[in-house]
């Protein structure tokens, strides 16, 4: 059995400049997957860019809980957002048993809020791409509660 290295161009949908670089990396054989953040304004343009320049490229869902705004109504996921309705940065999260060193704060997102936002991001991905994600990964941080949400959404 041969092994295959999967190199993911994470954060696809973050900005036009980044997206152009990710597509270039895919077309030149550096990246094998484009991993889409769906909670950005750029996400629809990123999908269009992929469809025009490399429609064969596999897209993954890059679940984001700690940068920018959520897909869900912020009022429905209070443990994930600040008073402006933006995600708490990963540096504000509690460092849990998984020991992510960037997490140095007091924010502890609940399983229910993580699950609700993940489901919203899966739905948004399906709206943008026209199909459910075949691969899902996390942006920036991973916690045990996030793993539970990933398993629940399955």
Enumerate the predicted regions with their spans.
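A short alpha/beta connector and helix-capping loop motif
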Residues: 16-42
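Acidic (Asp/Glu)-rich catalytic clusters
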Residues: 22-28, 44-58, 75, 79-82, ...
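Catalytic domains of cell-wall/extracellular-matrix polysaccharide-remodeling enzymes
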Residues: 111-112, 119-154
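Active-site gating loops and adjacent loop-to-helix segments of metal-dependent hydrolytic enzymes
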Residues: 70-107
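Structural preference for beta-strand elements that scaffold enzyme active sites
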Residues: 4-6, 31-35, 56-62, 133-137
């Amino acid at each position: 059995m041969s092994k295959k290295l999967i190199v993911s161009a994470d954060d696809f949908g973050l900005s036009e400049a980044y997206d152009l670089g990710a597509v270039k990396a895919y077309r030149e054989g550096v990246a094998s997957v484009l991993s889409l953040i769906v909670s950005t304004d750029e996400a629809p343009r990123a999908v269009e860019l992929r469809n025009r320049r490399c429609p064969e490229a596999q897209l993954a869902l890059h679940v984001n809980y700690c940068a920018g705004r959520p897909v869900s109504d912020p009022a429905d996921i209070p443990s994930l957002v600040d008073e402006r309705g933006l995600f708490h940065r990963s540096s504000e999260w509690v460092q849990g048993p998984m020991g992510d060193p960037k997490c140095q704060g007091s924010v502890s997102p609940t399983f229910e809020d993580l699950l609700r936002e993940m489901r919203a991001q899966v739905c948004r991905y399906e709206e943008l791409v026209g199909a459910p994600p075949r691969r899902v990964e996390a942006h920036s941080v991973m916690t045990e509660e996030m793993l539970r949400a990933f398993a629940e959404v399955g």
